Amino acid sequence: MGQKVHPHGLRVGVIKEWDAKWYADKKNFADNLVEDHKIRNFVKKNSYAAGVSRIEIERAAKRIKLNIYTAKPGMIIGKGGQGIESLKNQLQKIVSNKNILINIVEVKRPEADAQLIAENIAQQLEKRIAFRRAMKQSIQRAMKSGVKGIKTACSGRLAGAEIARTEHYNEGTIPLQTLRADIDYGFAEADTTYGKIGVKVWVYKGEVLPARKNINEKEEANA
């Protein structure tokens, strides 16, 4: 049975960038990695209602810059910036002797963001909404927003069934093996009374590299 590689990992260095942008020697690498993990978990847990899509971490000598991509920036920033100051103070306890800079980036189309779609489906499952309805509604909203294709999968004791299973729904195209295809991937878990249900979402937003190819062709023609 074929297993699918993570769409982001496959495309890093081709059309995707790293979520952690820093370099460290052997002595500090593990500490930085654990610190990153703690930061991501804390921000995600603390600002779950704000719809955090992803967190980029950049490091300099004594400085950490966080780029937080969120659907509802106002919920994180708070009234007069109080929320962001509170978040910064709490994060300061996790990272010692380092200055933290927080940059909030708004996700313009949350209905086309794979991570936010997965979390939305998971939240609906926790509210006992039928999984098929939750998946189909998310697919319809994503297709209306202009994506080229979307695929969703729910795994677990669906509708309280005795035997766990996986159900997929998709619309449009999802070229997983095409490296120039901009495929967004999201994963979330729903805690239901019957146990956990895993939600996976793949969103195809179109090809990324053709413009560069056309520029090269024009340069060759001019030469």
Curated annotation (Swiss-Prot):
Name of the protein in its database record: Small ribosomal subunit protein uS3
Assembly and oligomerization: Part of the 30S ribosomal subunit. Forms a tight complex with proteins S10 and S14.
Recorded family membership: Belongs to the universal ribosomal protein uS3 family.
Pfam families associated with the record: KH_2, Ribosomal_S3_C
InterPro entries: KH_dom, KH_dom-like_a/b, KH_dom_type_2, KH_sf_prok-type, Ribosomal_S3_C_sf, Ribosomal_uS3_bac-typ, Ribosomal_uS3_C, Ribosomal_uS3_CS
Organism: Clostridium botulinum (strain 657 / Type Ba4)
Organism taxonomic ancestry: Bacteria, Bacillati, Bacillota, Clostridia, Eubacteriales
GO biological process, one term: translation
Gene behind the chain: rpsC
Role description: Binds the lower part of the 30S subunit head. Binds mRNA in the 70S ribosome, positioning it for translation.
